[in-house]
Amino acid sequence: MGSVTEPSRAQDSVDMSGILFGKDFVQQNTVMTSLININSPMTFDGIMMGALAVYAQANQAAIVSPFIVGGAMAPVTVAGTLTQVLAEVLAGVSYSQLVRPGAPVIAGAFVTSIDMNSGAPTFGTPEAAHITYGTGQLVRRLGLPYRSAGAFCGSKLPDAQAAYESANSLNMGL
């Protein structure tokens, strides 16, 4: 997994791959991937944009993934959040293609919701599952590979809540 914490570190990752595989091979073949997180709502910071440009120029894959907490950073409805996820992913994909047409890109999504009483994030909820499934359907229709998050929970103990949330969030990720 390539570094995305600063564009120069992304370039270091590409350069290390060039040492391992050969520079020409790396330019012709995808040998690594990176995870570009979008700061929802609809914010691409300079660090992520710079790293995305480095990987696109080098023909290396980038997972373009919004980090969305429904009800806090996105609409509370499934349809509203799904719309935002797709808009953010397509913005990242488009930028990557402007940098290098044909650059490999993977659509991603990290979606959860918020407890409107406490403000705490919730995991393994039906809403997050619907958004994750919906995103997968939409990006597959667009011909993009898809990656989603899973196997996380908000429980403080290894208890029934942890098991339920982990299982449900893992299931939607599969």
Predicted ranges, named:
Residues 1-174:
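Helix-rich catalytic cores of soluble enzyme domains
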